[in-house]
Design a protein with these regions (language model features):
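Mid/C-terminal beta-alpha module of Rossmann-like enzyme folds, strongest
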Residues: 193-250, 279-288
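Active-site Tyr-X1-5-Lys
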Residues: 120-146
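Glycine/proline-rich active-site loop of Rossmann-fold NAD(P)-dependent oxidoreductases
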Residues: 130, 142, 153-164, 196-206, ...
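Glycine-rich NAD(P)-binding loop of the Rossmann-fold in SDR/ketoreductase-type enzymes
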Residues: 69-77, 123, 127-128, 185
């Protein structure tokens, strides 16, 4: 029996992990802790084998006025949670970082994350995650620390870029043919990965991803097909998009950012869902 504490109550990722683990009550005992409650520090972590930390401010387009808040939540709160876990005997701490610690994707040029790629975040969201990693890894204890740097995560009722792409794919008659490659991670595959990490009591830095990267236009085609919508791919918009490549929304949709498969080829067999299956599940809005 492993006791797992999810720090971040009712979070998107935490809820999927909780639901999966609770399918085997003889193997896992799961609890959630609301870190928005100022009294969270009174909660004892003693007796828990794993703390899965998902509390944090999500990647959006925040303005400068939110900068301090991002560091308070994404850096300092994460560090204090890990420190408390280490002091109270937790065996494994899993921290959700992000691929954004490497910087954003680039339009028009290939960008591959390898083991030599330095951490060069270009937003304070990315830097807040980087600083959290540094502080958490500096904790001197026997607690195993797991840092996850996933690419864009999507799934049923997800937030961020995917819902925008889905709406576009369902309604627009046209979409640019501008080529790009981007690593993605279906929430169902992430859940399987986290289960493996817990079961095998792993530690280290991991970059899980789907089996293959995907081009945005191919993703749009799959989504449109799920809804019986015909969409035509045209090149007329490509020059304009290239001129707008520094715009955040263009970079997010058409930027190139892939993870070297060598960094994700763990012998863990966690990619349970293919891209096609993941799109079917996501667009149906169902569960895993």
């Amino acid at each position: 029996m492993k006791k797992v504490l999810i720090t971040g109550k009712n979070s998107y990722l935490g809820s999927f992990v909780r639901n999966e683990l609770e399918r085997k009550p003889e193997t896992y005992q799961v609890a959630e802790l609301d870190l928005k409650d100022p009294k969270w520090t009174d909660f004892s972590f003693e007796g828990y084998d794993v703390v899965y930390h998902v509390a944090g401010l999500a990647h959006s387009t925040p303005d400068e006025s939110q900068k301090d808040l991002y560091y308070q939540i994404n850096t300092e709160l994460a560090y204090q949670t890990a420190l408390k876990a280490s002091r109270e005997g937790v065996k494994q701490f899993i921290f959700m970082s992000s691929i954004i610690v490497y910087g954003s994707g680039k339009v028009g040029c290939k960008r591959t994350i390898t083991k030599e790629t330095p951490l060069t975040p270009d937003t304070f969201y990315g830097d807040s995650k980087k600083q959290a990693e540094i502080k958490i890894r500096s904790i001197d204890s026997d607690m195993k620390v797991v840092i996850l740097r996933p690419p864009m995560i999507y799934g049923p009722h997800s937030k961020g870029n995917y819902p925008l792409l889905s709406k576009f794919a369902q309604k627009s008659p046209f979409f640019p043919t501008l080529g790009n490659e981007r690593s993605m991670l279906f929430v169902g595959n992430l859940v399987q990965f986290i289960k493996k990490v817990i079961d095998l009591e792993l530690e280290g830095i991991f970059l899980p991803q789907n089996q293959k990267p995907v081009q945005t236009k191919d993703l749009i085609a799959l989504i449109a097909r799920e809804h019986g919508h015909t969409i035509h791919f045209v090149s007329v918009f490509n020059p304009v998009l290239k001129c707008m490549r520094k715009q955040t929304i263009v970079s997010k949709v058409f930027g190139n950012l892939i993870i070297d498969p060598a960094l994700s080829s763990f012998d863990l067999d966690y990619t349970k869902y293919s891209l096609e299956q993941s799109i079917q599940i996501t667009e149906s809005g169902g569960g895993l």
